[in-house]
Amino acid sequence: MSHGPKGDINKQEWEDVEFPSICERCLGDNSYVRMTKEPLGQECKICSKPCTIFRWIKERGQKPGKTQICVGCARYKNCCQSCMLDLQFGLPIALRDAALKLVESGPTNDINREFFAQNQQRLLSNGETAYDSQEASAAARNLVKKVEKRELHSRPPKRKLDDVESKQILKEARASDASLNAERPLFPVKKIINGNVSLSINMEPPKDKKIASLFLIGVEDELADYKIRKHFEQYGPLKSVVCSHRAKCAFVNFKTRSSAEIAAAASPDGNVVIEGFRLKVQWGKPRSLGGPEGEVRNAKLADLVMRGSSHGNKTSQKSTIKNIENEDHENTKSPAVAIPIDPNQPRYRSQIPR
């Protein structure tokens, strides 16, 4: 009499899930995430059982996310399958367990780890869990809150570009100008200090009488094309406004050279404010901004230029405010001071000696 193969209880306990347990930080803000599933694609880093791998891309250009542990261990540890951070406090599970002493570390032997995971899976299926945050003592909870303020879920600040990176971006921009045989560079850089770029803008009309366009730097997404058109129409009729929000730049093309000269004369220092947005303006001949790569490069240069100009404006504003305060102090009259009354001075006429 032949018998079938003996069933393996460990294989019966292998997981087959349709969706992972991931925190919002790892999943990202996109509501339409494309996720791939690979059943039994790896070994869980906690219980060493085969588990399903889920992969996804949070944002374009970033490294794909991936699950590291099985769903059972994630629920038992109350952590994310990808970053393995606690879902309540945002801390590494080893630090959390040491502080709160809620979850045991478990066995280290492979076979014992599988047996331990089976028992925990059975508890979860019955609606029980070994993790209970209410059991934490007040002292341990205060310790976790102190560590939580310094831990991982705060986003790191954006790194500023240094002089080397700024010069590399500028070098690429000059190479693009040379390939187009451009007479005037889009970004006439004067100097670079601490990653900030200052321009040497010359608002004198160019010798080429055919140039009747102005080039704007620092065009944000909130500044629409029609607002730029509305601002410059006061100086004369416009031929077109070519705006690239991705490059943070725009060309304002006038129908006549005289209108362009009037608009340039209105901004002798190369600064213009449109609907509350501060921009840099200079003469420029319309041309391509270099495709997607060139637009990204020009956007970085525009950020460096606007950051450098804002730094200079802050210094000048401080000195201006200080001068205004000094003038106000000089022009302010001293307040009237009441003279104290002598207590021996007679208050009534009858008390005055004759």
Curated annotation (Swiss-Prot):
<dbReference type="InterPro" id="IPR034356">
    <property type="entry name" value="Slt11_RRM"/>
</dbReference>
<keyword id="KW-0507">mRNA processing</keyword>
<comment type="similarity">
    <text>Belongs to the RRM SLT11 family.</text>
</comment>
<dbReference type="InterPro" id="IPR000504">
    <property type="entry name" value="RRM_dom"/>
</dbReference>
<dbReference type="GO" id="GO:0036002">
    <property type="term" value="F:pre-mRNA binding"/>
</dbReference>
<dbReference type="InterPro" id="IPR035979">
    <property type="entry name" value="RBD_domain_sf"/>
</dbReference>
<dbReference type="InterPro" id="IPR012677">
    <property type="entry name" value="Nucleotide-bd_a/b_plait_sf"/>
</dbReference>
<dbReference type="GO" id="GO:0071014">
    <property type="term" value="C:post-mRNA release spliceosomal complex"/>
</dbReference>
<dbReference type="InterPro" id="IPR048995">
    <property type="entry name" value="STL11/RBM22-like_N"/>
</dbReference>
<comment type="function">
    <text>Facilitates the cooperative formation of U2/U6 helix II in association with stem II in the spliceosome. Binds to RNA. Involved in pre-mRNA splicing.</text>
</comment>
<feature type="region of interest" description="Disordered">
    <location>
        <begin position="308"/>
        <end position="354"/>
    </location>
</feature>
<dbReference type="Pfam" id="PF21369">
    <property type="entry name" value="STL11_N"/>
</dbReference>
<keyword id="KW-0539">Nucleus</keyword>
<feature type="compositionally biased region" description="Polar residues">
    <location>
        <begin position="310"/>
        <end position="323"/>
    </location>
</feature>
<protein>
    <recommendedName>
        <fullName>Pre-mRNA-splicing factor cwf5</fullName>
    </recommendedName>
</protein>
<dbReference type="GO" id="GO:0005681">
    <property type="term" value="C:spliceosomal complex"/>
</dbReference>
<keyword id="KW-0508">mRNA splicing</keyword>
<comment type="subunit">
    <text>Belongs to the 40S cdc5-associated complex (or cwf complex), a spliceosome sub-complex reminiscent of a late-stage spliceosome composed of the U2, U5 and U6 snRNAs and at least brr2, cdc5, cwf2/prp3, cwf3/syf1, cwf4/syf3, cwf5/ecm2, spp42/cwf6, cwf7/spf27, cwf8, cwf9, cwf10, cwf11, cwf12, prp45/cwf13, cwf14, cwf15, cwf16, cwf17, cwf18, cwf19, cwf20, cwf21, cwf22, cwf23, cwf24, cwf25, cwf26, cyp7/cwf27, cwf28, cwf29/ist3, lea1, msl1, prp5/cwf1, prp10, prp12/sap130, prp17, prp22, sap61, sap62, sap114, sap145, slu7, smb1, smd1, smd3, smf1, smg1 and syf2.</text>
</comment>
<dbReference type="InterPro" id="IPR039171">
    <property type="entry name" value="Cwc2/Slt11"/>
</dbReference>
<dbReference type="GO" id="GO:0017070">
    <property type="term" value="F:U6 snRNA binding"/>
</dbReference>
<dbReference type="GO" id="GO:0071007">
    <property type="term" value="C:U2-type catalytic step 2 spliceosome"/>
</dbReference>
<keyword id="KW-0694">RNA-binding</keyword>
<feature type="domain" description="RRM">
    <location>
        <begin position="212"/>
        <end position="286"/>
    </location>
</feature>
<dbReference type="Pfam" id="PF00076">
    <property type="entry name" value="RRM_1"/>
</dbReference>
<dbReference type="GO" id="GO:0005634">
    <property type="term" value="C:nucleus"/>
</dbReference>
<dbReference type="GO" id="GO:0000974">
    <property type="term" value="C:Prp19 complex"/>
</dbReference>
<dbReference type="GO" id="GO:0071006">
    <property type="term" value="C:U2-type catalytic step 1 spliceosome"/>
</dbReference>
<dbReference type="GO" id="GO:0045292">
    <property type="term" value="P:mRNA cis splicing, via spliceosome"/>
</dbReference>
<keyword id="KW-0747">Spliceosome</keyword>
